[in-house]
Structure formats: structure tokens, C-alpha cells
Regions:
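A C-terminal cap/extension of S-adenosyl-L-methionine-dependent methyltransferases
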Residues: 3-6, 234-236, 269-324
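Conserved class I S-adenosyl-L-methionine
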Residues: 43-127, 130, 134, 218-240
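Conserved SAM/SAH-binding beta-strand->alpha-helix loop
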Residues: 148-150
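A conserved beta-strand element that flanks and buttresses the S-adenosyl-L-methionine
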Residues: 187
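A short glycine-rich, Lys/Arg-flanked "PGG" loop and its adjoining helix->strand segment in the class I
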Residues: 201-213
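Acceptor-substrate binding/catalytic loop of class I
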Residues: 235-253
Length: 324
């Protein structure tokens, strides 16, 4: 890990400074966090996990088992990382199931933010690092966090292959292991939507703490009034959802929650007819999905001049200025 990250890592339990002791980071209260393959693992074992990756990582660390990628450096040369081949539909959306294990390139999306100019960027729930890499290639200095040690090693491998300068930490979004006000920008995509609303709000509070005053926060969330979202809710009987199910929010509820946690917030359309649709990936997807993506992009662009369309977008962005 680089010197900036080391200086700004704190105990996720009590936010105290950490000391290096052999292969651990230790705070004054003797909370210990292993460093595996130069990746800090900052998870809390006494907290109820909100994703099976937390349990899996804690078990691997307890058994002193590192993912194979930590030992062999991941995929060789230009080969697509095996973890990414397997995980892509779970990180990018249902449209990607037909190309699972068939990727010919990494689906790196367009980050809808201005150039980074070296700003410190936090990618919350990075998994294999597609948005972390996108941020690095746009001039940010990004740190990605995820509860999966396997995902983080894959992310590090992808970064190396893409020539992107990135850093990664294994952490729980509800207990961020960073000093107050150390990031200029925070970002999250297809992550908080799968948290209970209580856990999502806890995560937003931690993001607000970690981002500088007047820093920017851009987070994707699902809109319960989108056509595809309504269909998915009907399929499950309009239940609230459990475990890592998607929780659907109304635009009004989102604006209220984000304004309370950050301050000034605006809502814009991300995509229509589903979650996670990315025009940059149209060459990777089957022909039958291309009309969906083109239609989504048309409506997204139209929503700039017709803001009411945001109310029926399936996926929205909340862009906030941190005043907390």
C-alpha cells in the first residue's frame, strides 16, 4: 500500500491510529487487522455480516488461506482474470449473464465525473475494480474497498493489466477504516441498493465522515417507479427484500435521505429498462440487448431537457456536496 493510504487508515471500530506489528495493523485498544499480500483486511468479526463475502474472507484469513491470486499474481499477460469472468453478471447486471466466462476485454464503464486532477477517490464496494480503474484512468487517485479478499486481488490484477494506479482495502462499508475528511470524492455503483435501508443509511454516514467538506459524492440507487423495477418488485410480491436483495427507493425518499446525510443533492437518470446498463459495453453484449441499451441511453440524454423522466428511470444517480 502507498504511504498516503497507510497514513489515513484507522481502526474501523474506534477510528484510532494504527501501528504496524509484523503482518498486522494494531490500534491502541489492541484491535488487530491482518495484512494479506499487502492488502489490509479491516473487517469486524463481531458484527452481523450483510454479505456472505464478509464471512468468507474472515474464514480465509482465520485459516491463513490466501486467494490463489495473491500467490500467483492473477491472470497472466492479457488474459481476462478468472474471478472477473465468473463475477461479471453479479457486478454488472443481468444483461451480462450470456457473456459470463466469455469476456474478451474488461468492461470498464464511463465515469460521469470531470477529470480527477489527482483528487483522492473512494470507490465503495469495488468488487473487481471496474469503477476504481475507470477513476484512475480519468486522473483520480482511487482507493477501492470491498468485503471480498478474492475480489480485491482480482481488482489489483485488473489494475496492473490496465496500467491503472490503484489501491485496495478489504472493508465493510458500514465501518470504513479511514480518517475523517481524507477523500475528495466518494462513489458507489450497484452496491448500496442491496443493503437494508438501515445499513444503507449507516454506510452513507460513514461516507460523509470520510469525505472532505464540500467534497463530491456520487452514488447509484434503484428507483421503485422504473418499469423494470416495478416488474421485479411485482415478481417478489412487493416484499421489502432480505439478505442481498435489491431494496427499491422512491425518488422522494432518496432525496430526503441523501440531503439529510450530505446536504445539497441532485438526482439524475442513470439508465432505463434495468440496472447497470452501460453504453461502453455494447460491443460485448448479444445483439438482442443492443436496442435496450440504445433506448436507455436515448432516454437518459432526453432526461437532461425533460427532468420528469428521472421519475421513471430504473436507475438514478444521487450527486451530493458534502456539508456534514
Amino acid at each position: 500500500m502507498n504511504s498516503w493510504l497507510r497514513e489515513n487508515l484507522v481502526c474501523p471500530r474506534d477510528k484510532k491510529k494504527l501501528q504496524d506489528k509484523e503482518n498486522y495493523l494494531v490500534c491502541s485498544e489492541n484491535h488487530r487487522y491482518p495484512v494479506v499480500g499487502d492488502v489490509p483486511v479491516m473487517l469486524l468479526d463481531e458484527i452481523e455480516p450483510n454479505h456472505h463475502y464478509i464471512t468468507e474472507t474472515l474464514e480465509d484469513v482465520a485459516d491463513n488461506q490466501s486467494p490463489a491470486a495473491a500467490k500467483n499474481g492473477g491472470a497472466a499477460g492479457g488474459a481476462i482474470d478468472e474471478f472477473v469472468q465468473d463475477e461479471v453478471p453479479h457486478t454488472c447486471g443481468n444483461l451480462y449473464f450470456p457473456i459470463r466466462y466469455k469476456l474478451t476485454r474488461y468492461p470498464i464503464p464511463e465515469l460521469r465525473l470531470p477529470g480527477g486532477d489527482g483528487k483522492r477517490f473512494l470507490d465503495v464496494g469495488c468488487n473487481w475494480g471496474r469503477w476504481t480503474v475507470a477513476a484512475a484512468l480519468k486522473g483520480y487517485q482511487p482507493v477501492g474497498i470491498d468485503p471480498s479478499l478474492k475480489a480485491v486481488f482480482a481488482a489489483r490484477n485488473v489494475s496492473r493489466q490496465m496500467g491503472a494506479a490503484t489501491e485496495f482495502v478489504v472493508a465493510d462499508t458500514r465501518y470504513l477504516p479511514f480518517a475523517d475528511s481524507c477523500f475528495d470524492v466518494a462513489f458507489s455503483y450497484l452496491v448500496l441498493q442491496s443493503f437494508s435501508k438501515e445499513n444503507a443509511k449507516i454506510s452513507l454516514q460513514e461516507i460523509a465522515r470520510s469525505v472532505k467538506a464540500d467534497g463530491k459524492i456520487l452514488i447509484q440507487m434503484p428507483n421503485k417507479f422504473g418499469a423494470r423495477s416495478f416488474y421485479q418488485q411485482a415478481r417478489r410480491g412487493f416484499s421489502k427484500g432480505e439478505d442481498f436483495d435489491i431494496r427499491y427507493w422512491s425518488p422522494t425518499e432518496l432525496m430526503k435521505t441523501f440531503t439529510e446525510n450530505f446536504g445539497e443533492t441532485k438526482i439524475t437518470a442513470d439508465c432505463f429498462f434495468g440496472l447497470g446498463l452501460q453504453k461502453n459495453d455494447i460491443d460485448l453484449l448479444p445483439a438482442r440487448f443492443k436496442t435496450v441499451i440504445h433506448s436507455s441511453e436515448f432516454l437518459r440524454r432526453a432526461s437532461v431537457k425533460m427532468p420528469w423522466l428521472v421519475n421513471v428511470a430504473d436507475s438514478v444517480y444521487l450527486e451530493s456536496i458534502n456539508r456534514k
